[in-house]
Amino acid sequence: MSEAEARPTNFIRQIIDEDLASGKHTTVHTRFPPEPNGYLHIGHAKSICLNFGIAQDYKGQCNLRFDDTNPVKEDIEYVDSIKNDVEWLGFHWSGNVRYSSDYFDQLHAYAIELINKGLAYVDELTPEQIREYRGTLTQPGKNSPYRDRSVEENLALFEKMRTGGFEEGKACLRAKIDMASPFIVMRDPVLYRIKFAEHHQTGNKWCIYPMYDFTHCISDALEGITHSLCTLEFQDNRRLYDWVLDNITIPVHPRQYEFSRLNLEYTVMSKRKLNLLVTDKHVEGWDDPRMPTISGLRRRGYTAASIREFCKRIGVTKQDNTIEMASLESCIREDLNENAPRAMAVIDPVKLVIENYQGEGEMVTMPNHPNKPEMGSRQVPFSGEIWIDRADFREEANKQYKRLVLGKEVRLRNAYVIKAERVEKDAEGNITTIFCTYDADTLSKDPADGRKVKGVIHWVSAAHALPVEIRLYDRLFSVPNPGAADDFLSVINPESLVIKQGFAEPSLKDAVAGKAFQFEREGYFCLDSRHSTAEKPVFNRTVGLRDTWAKVGE
């Protein structure tokens, strides 16, 4: 199979193939242009994988450009986190990081060119009046009384805006297009507004800032972008994108192409709503493992490879759709099943005493991965007192229950066969200790008399156990589409985080943040980067061993 045949295919790649075949372009140059006013989420990951992936596959270039035209909402903290997320996902931008603010002088010059051509004017309507004059989807707008100012007056007023002669909201520069256009975006859109705010890149040099629609297309052209890819909500904006480039003196005219944005069940992607979750402390920050942010997914234990695989599987189309959470979870589950070393941890512990076990203990050998001998093995301490999970024992049970039952046998993982003899309870009737006997000749082998022991449970030696906090994360919302609720905060899942105190095998004291483990029979977990200490490790559940979403949907 050739390199071209091995590539994923979608309508954007078909356009690129046609452009290259026809000679319209000889190379491919894309860009990823986030606004640095928040943390990237899984939806941005789709755009990152698309833009950087195309550049990678076609041996072209992809720029990282920050659309930093609103100093009030932006911060260098977001710039740094976005760069980190792009690199963590496995991509590298072409050349230096770029900023729309790099082009403020050129953008200002192009605004003056539009004024000189009679295609832009300074408007002194209030923001409320501008909205009122704009009209509706069914009614045309009406012209501003300031629309027919002379070129000379507009130039003077625009210079007054630039030098701080107007208060915020008292004047703006608008394109002179058509107030009766069926497309509201073309009804004399604002090109520049006044903001007396310090900019994280340009300081206090400017008090006028260009709008996204004016900045974006010119930045693309100045950088030689061949294919400007954005989500479907910018479809109507393409008309303004083309209008600006058609009416200024610039040699390059990129084309904009739209694809569907990523919608994921049981979460929200709106930056405003995500910000509300953080500021109202429904979550502990932008990197909370329940958040759909890349930093939250990373802290939860998602790998870059699993997110790239997810973006590959959902594909690129023009149809908006909502992706099931199971699709995302299956990608990380497959990745970790293949690559995560195994370990034992008991999440809901109950003491088990082996009454006929002699000696202080021994070491048993366990494979780090059942199907990958190259991952080696480890020595795990075993003793006569162990912790098992409370759910792995019943005093009475039917034949379907394959774990430990009073009077019956079960195998301890990679250790011995044990038999439950009796229990001890507290005053409330809760089991505090299970007393067992063991068959000393069954260390990692079947009983000599041929009897069959079907169940296998995991365990941790009590004398060697590492106390751990285990955070069981679940979906953040209790309904598939929380954004459709009258109050999305009212459908937050109260069980989205359950904290347990358990015990783990001592090898996990060497765990590092970002490396996942399969806790045998429990799920996939990783060390929490924020709350863990050497004395008390904290592990986050990344995903369960099986798909729990099928049941949720029933």
Curated annotation (Swiss-Prot):
L-glutamine binds at residues 67, 212. Its EC number is 6.1.1.18. Keywords: Aminoacyl-tRNA synthetase, ATP-binding, Cytoplasm, Ligase, Nucleotide-binding, Protein biosynthesis. Residues 317-324 are annotated as: Interaction with tRNA. It catalyses: tRNA(Gln) + L-glutamine + ATP = L-glutaminyl-tRNA(Gln) + AMP + diphosphate. It is found in: Cytoplasm. One of its GO terms (cellular component) is cytosol. A motif ('HIGH' region) lies at residues 34-44. This is Glutamine--tRNA ligase. It comes from Escherichia coli O6:H1 (strain CFT073 / ATCC 700928 / UPEC). The gene is glnS.
